[in-house]
Regions:
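Juxtadomain coupling helices with adjacent low-complexity linkers
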Residues: 2, 18, 124, 130-153
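Regulatory sensory and allosteric helical modules in signal-transduction proteins
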Residues: 45, 53, 57-105
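Short hydrophobic/aromatic beta-strand element in the GNAT-like acyltransferase core
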Residues: 47, 112, 125
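Short coil/turn motifs at secondary-structure junctions
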Residues: 55, 118, 131-133
Length: 153
C-alpha cells in the first residue's frame, strides 16, 4: 500500500477506535475491538491478536485469523523479542528470524508492539502476521503504537 494511503487509513482507524473505546473501560473489550477493526481494515493483516504476560508466560488472548499458539515458549520468537527489548519489532521475513515460532506456516512477515501498564511494565503485545514478505514498516510501527495506546485511555 502506498505510504500516504496507509497513513490516512491508520488515522481513520485510530479515530474510529478512539470513538469506540471510550464506551467501555474493560481491557478485554478494548483489545477485541482493536483486533477486529485492524484485522478487517488492513488487507495485509493475516493474523492479528494480543498475547498477555501471565505468570511469566505469554498467553494468547483476543485474536482474529487462523488458530493461534496458545502459549509462546519463554524468550523465543518475535513476541518475546518485543518484550525483552522493550520496543516494537518488525520482521520482514520470519523465516530469517532466529527462534521464530511458526503458529501458521503461511506467515511471512510480522510486527510486534509491546504495551505497558500504568507502572511502565510491559504486560502484553499486539502481534500481527502477514502472508506477504516485508509487509510492515515504520509507518505501521508508528500507528500501531498509537492504536494500542488507546487501551489505556
Amino acid at each position: 500500500m502506498e505510504s500516504q494511503k496507509k497513513k490516512d487509513r491508520y488515522l481513520r482507524i485510530y479515530h474510529q477506535l478512539k470513538d469506540f473505546l471510550v464506551k467501555s473501560d474493560d481491557i478485554d473489550a478494548r483489545m477485541a475491538t482493536i483486533v477486529a477493526v485492524l484485522h478487517h481494515k488492513m488487507e495485509t493483516f493475516f493474523w492479528t491478536g494480543f498475547y498477555c504476560l501471565k505468570d511469566g508466560e505469554l498467553i494468547v488472548k483476543t485474536y482474529q485469523g487462523p488458530v493461534a499458539c496458545q502459549v509462546l515458549k519463554k524468550n523465543t520468537g518475535v513476541c518475546w523479542a518485543g518484550i525483552n527489548q522493550g520496543k516494537t519489532i518488525i520482521v520482514p521475513d520470519v523465516h530469517q528470524f532466529p527462534g521464530h515460532i511458526a503458529c501458521d506456516s503461511r506467515s511471512k512477515s510480522e510486527i510486534v508492539v509491546p504495551l505497558k501498564d500504568t507502572a511502565n511494565r510491559i504486560i502484553r503485545v499486539l502481534d500481527v502476521d502477514s502472508t506477504t514478505l516485508n509487509a510492515f514498516d515504520q509507518t505501521d510501527a508508528q500507528y500501531l503504537e498509537m492504536i494500542v495506546g488507546l487501551i489505556n485511555l
